Amino acid sequence: MKTAYVVDAGVAVKWYLPEIHSGHALRLLRKRFDLQAPELIQAEFGNILWKKCRAGEFEGTTAGEILDSFMRSPLRVHPHRAILSLAWGIAMKHRQTFYDSLYLALAMTEKARMVTADRKFYDALAGTPAERHLFWIEEVP
């Protein structure tokens, strides 16, 4: 049975764009883990590409190709409905965005670990019981 990891959009975008920690993110793909995310990742990933296009980092056609490639990635996408209440509780308890809390709620539900490149989110949950469901991107085995 493959080890399951929930990845956020900040990790997934590093599969396609050379950024800090891209090597760590790519290891997730190369080792063929069971990669999962809430369906929100598709919108967040597209928005990251849109922002980079607006900033002039690359053309829209390139972003479209990256988005197409992402949609073919070995990422198992889950609907939100079953994790909404848990995500809300996480967001309120830890004062984190509902968006980020959806990823953590999925990790908890799937008995997986969430891999994040969002330092602020990771640090906010350090020292809490939720930390056992988190991996900082540099901790990827």
Question: Language-model segments: which ranges?
Answer:
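Active-site-proximal, substrate-binding regions of enzyme catalytic domains
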Residues: 46-78, 86
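Short, well-structured N-terminal submotif of metal-dependent ribonuclease cores
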Residues: 1-41, 52-65, 120
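Short, conserved alpha-helical segments within structured domains
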Residues: 41-42, 62, 83, 103
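Residue-level signal for well-ordered alpha-helical positions
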Residues: 19, 28, 48, 90, ...
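Active-site neighborhoods of divalent-metal-dependent phosphate/nucleic-acid chemistry enzymes
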Residues: 75-117
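Phosphate- and divalent-cation-binding pockets in alpha/beta enzyme and binding domains
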Residues: 24, 44, 86, 123-124
